[in-house]
Each structure stands twice: as C-alpha cells, then as structure tokens.
Amino acid sequence: LKQNYPNPFNPVTRIEFSIPEPARVSLKIYDVAGRLVDVLVDETRPAGVYTETWNGRDRLGNAAASGVYFCRIVAGDLVRTRKMVLLR
C-alpha cells in the first residue's frame, strides 16, 4: 500500500496498492475514532497493481469533514495502514 496522492487532498485522492498473488482484498477508510467511513474494495482480485480513488465522501455520499483518515488494506496475510489528511 503506497501513500495516497495527493496528501493532503481535496476533494479526491488516489490510493495505489499491489498484491503479489490472487487474494481477497479489503480496502477501507476509517476516521480517527476508528469508525468505518467508506469501503473502496471488498472482493477477490488477481495479482497486480491497482489504483483506487476516494472522493472524500462516506458510504452514504455525505462529504467527510476535514481531518485525518486512515486507509487500511487487508489482502491475504498483508495488513497495512496509511494516514491521509482531507482539507475542505
């Protein structure tokens, strides 16, 4: 899981990640309190390099507030988290 770009961002950021073998991939956004904000990926993917976009909105389409968010990927045994900053 690479660092998102741009960071800080407004209104959109890109998140790049790679998986070395086919795996169930979960890529989720959390706020600083640990609450789930959005789910970007939740499916099985073949090995490869991927780029996902987060539009700074929650699962209901509401604009997320300015602040720190965490992007967490789980793919097989891989678990990584990166910090992102949304500036409105």
List each language-model region with its residue ranges.
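Conserved Rossmann-like nucleotide-cofactor binding loop
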Residues: 35
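Short beta-strand edge segments in extracellular beta-sheet folds
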Residues: 84-88
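Short, acidic, Ser/Thr-enriched surface-loop or helix-capping motifs
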Residues: 31-32, 58
